[in-house]
């Protein structure tokens, strides 16, 4: 085995099965690119990203763990978000929640 090597079985794996999702239109109104990681609480992203923040509370990007989405200046794109799991408590990030959702 090589360090970091994967042994993947044939077939498909459904990620985030059964969790609530929402699709939002997100615009970068800033003058610099903004990158958001897979497990960042989307509600608390950079204020230059314009979208329905209330709909994003308790959600993260519905993408593979360890990856990210980049928003170029002036770019608008749709993203799918998925509900956070576990205890549904959020601490850190920008400090906008600091507790239960």
From Swiss-Prot:
Chief location of this protein within or outside the cell: cytoplasm
Keyword Cytoplasm: yes
Alphabetical GO biological process terms: urea catabolic process
Any one Pfam family match given in the protein's UniProt record, by short name: Urease_beta
Cellular compartment(s): Cytoplasm
The keyword Thylakoid is annotated on this UniProt entry: no
GO cellular component: urease complex
Record EC number: 3.5.1.5
PANTHER family, per the entry: UREASE
Database matches in HAMAP family: Urease_beta
Family label: Belongs to the urease beta subunit family.
Official protein name in the record: Urease subunit beta
Organism: Rhodopseudomonas palustris (strain BisA53)
């Amino acid at each position: 085995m090589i360090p970091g090597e994967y042994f993947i079985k044939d077939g498909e794996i459904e990620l985030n099965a059964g969790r609530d999702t929402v699709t939002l239109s997100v615009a970068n109104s800033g003058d610099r690119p903004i990158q958001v990681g897979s497990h960042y609480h989307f509600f608390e992203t950079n204020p230059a990203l314009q979208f329905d923040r209330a709909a994003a509370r308790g959600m993260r990007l519905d993408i593979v763990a360890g990856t990210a989405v980049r928003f170029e200046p002036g770019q608008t794109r749709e993203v799918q978000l998925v509900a956070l799991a576990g205890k549904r408590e959020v601490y850190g990030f920008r400090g906008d929640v600091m507790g239960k959702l």
